[in-house]
Swiss-Prot record:
Spans annotated as Disordered: 402-444
Protein name: Integrator complex subunit 15
Function: Component of the integrator complex, a multiprotein complex that terminates RNA polymerase II (Pol II) transcription in the promoter-proximal region of genes.
Gene name of the record: ints15
Compartment(s): Nucleus; Chromosome
Amino acid sequence: MSDIRHALLRRDPLSAAKEVLYHLDISLGSALQSSAGPPAGLEKSTVELVEEFIFHVSKDRNIQSKRMSCVQELQLLEIICSYFQEQSKDAIRQVIFSALFSLQGNKADESRMAMLGKLVSMSIAVCRVPILECAAIWLQRTHSAWCVRLAQVLMEDYCTLVPCAISTLQNICSASPRFCCQLITAVTALYDFSTDELTPPPALLEMLVGWITEDPRLLLLTFINSPLNSSLPLGCLEITPLLGLLRWCVKAPLAYHRGRKSAMTNGHGDGEKGTAYEELYSKLHLSVLQVFLMLQVHLTEKNMFCRLTVLPVESVAALIEEVGRLCEKLAPLLDASHIQLALDRLAQALQVAMATGALLCAREDLRALCSRLPHNNLLQLVMSGPVVQPPPHSSPFQPNMYPHIHPGRPSPLSPHSPHQSTLSSPHSPHTVLTAHPTHPALAPHRPLTAHATHPALSPHAFHPASIAFPYRPIR
């Protein structure tokens, strides 16, 4: 390997980089064909060649690395794009891509990320699907912090620097849906609504909603194509973008109202745009709920229903806790309807996720978490669980009861409530009248005589809606 290095040192930077690519193709391709699977790892000498002659980070501090000019760097990107486009074997492409851009935990990682961001951005512009497919696998196996950095580079190129370039990114969905699925996951991890800068740009939001409404199965693409028993590396992105999109939908009513309030303070309020954002998030929320239903079908077909978690309980608990803090912090500044909208979306998502098997969590545990949230009628019903059916011999008009999720507040529907009364059936031929302090007791089992002179009762006379129940709805 030292002979190869000395030969490469005599070449110009661009020629040396091409020679390293050729060397990787020969050595890793041969190793892949001779073994049953991909090589476990690269030799240290091979890694050093890649770092020194492609990313220009020399292992020898005494030797000044040859830096490429901007034109040479662009030429190198074209060479890499052409190599992956011409390589017909997907397994070899994946191995070479991993050899180039797998992070090693050293000073060369910054150069790797810089080159990777430019390569993926260029591949989107010229639609190099093989590189986008390799980048999708990279996003699936790499720590989320690096994935977020790559997503940030792409968002700056296609949403910030050249806003009209978003249409180029939008067209990639049909060419490489796997890459788009992973990009959505990375983008939802990038934009967490903590600041105005970390709020999804309108063009990005509109593009993602268009992708998902056109084909909601896009969100499950990585999950469906991954082995069910496979374990992801520690710290990597979620297996689906569902949790990240759910976080967007729940936090959007709070964050966007904050943004509009700031804009109106500065005299730049735009109500029409705010309404458009709200509609986009409503569409996105509906699509997420629909994907949960699709997920249930897939889990049932694979005999993994209620056996494989898709939404980690820890992540859902963190979201609930975060929403609680935001509601408490922003309550004096927000209209109550915005907080209720956020809680409504959270309640709907939790109910559908539990019903479809995406969230495996005891309802009692969720009830304890949600008890810290502001009161919300829908969340109250969801966390209370199924309706408690009355005993078979009780009154037909006795209301069903829900246990309250706020333990410090007694439920008005408690069976021990002093306002609870029992109604006897109006159709019983022998009505038992109980004793009353101001009236004489009637003989037991005294049949009531028919009143022929009275007009016939309306068929709706004993409809439950016509009876005033002694309880109030949950508020």
